[in-house]
Amino acid sequence: MLRFFIIFSVLLIGLFTLEILQPAEKYVILPFTSMVADISVWIVQGFDENVIATGNVIRDKVSGFGVRIERGCNGLEAVIILFSAIFAFPAPFKNKVIGFVAGFFAIQLLNLVRIISLYYLGQWNYTAFEWFHLYLWQALIILDALVVWLIWLRTLPGSRAHPDNLEPETA
């Protein structure tokens, strides 16, 4: 347990430090965040043609309302937490890679739901938008990383999560 905590802490601190460096901002964070905005708009345009993306901003062409996807709103912090937890845990490397890739997409999928819901919530009620943005959705994205990690733990070899590994109860 101590080994896990130390490796988890080192990975977490190291990755969050890398994330705030200027080259990471310029070459990873900003392009990724713009891509998240573009994907969000692509999804929304399936049922609302009045939405556009400009960089990291999603805007309604009619009302002018927009949301800016900033650092901390692109899901990468939750991905860093998940990566640190998965790669700190003693498990086969193949399982770590599979768990991380699946977890990355699970977090980003929920983040797209978050961004789109906040886009429409902000047009409806700005106070509700602020509350959901600052409190509910931030907690849910981090909780998503935790849930993905817990599910991943149950899929590891030797885990008792598989029904065929369970021994029958004795009477």
Predicted regions: what is each one?
Residues 1-171:
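Hydrophobic N-terminal alpha-helices or hydrophobic patches in metabolic proteins across all domains
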